[in-house]
């Protein structure tokens, strides 16, 4: 796994000392702390010679026993860090990584509370990375930063071409409740009531 590879590389660095040919790697403890923050400290991550284990409410779990939300976050965040360490090998702190990251439907398998927090958490840990998200969740929009710019992407039914709306600015949406945001032109939900029924749904946006 990514964490075990991190540990092996760090041990290799310690053995070889000040070898300038070795790339700098983010400390394993820093990565673990990042995961703990993203997982809301509900899961303890234990790295040992036997592998990586997770402890939740006193129970020891394998990776496959974690919830889909936890697994999803761990997989793509690990992949993100790994790719940045490969492309920027002399960076030793997470907040120094620079680049652009595209994430499709970040809300998948996440509880609404987590959806609202996740973008702010990522911005805190990676302030020099520009994140571009796609989402179908108004809760993700609620959690976006004040300087976020939002576009509605849609397919023109006449031409079949994909287009975008004019820009929405997050700071101009802060007054809206979640149900108001869902029924706004940005999402186009016809009615926010639970009992509302509709005969047709346009999912092309």
Locations of regions flagged by a protein language model:
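Conserved helicase/translocase motor-coupling segment
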Residues: 200-205
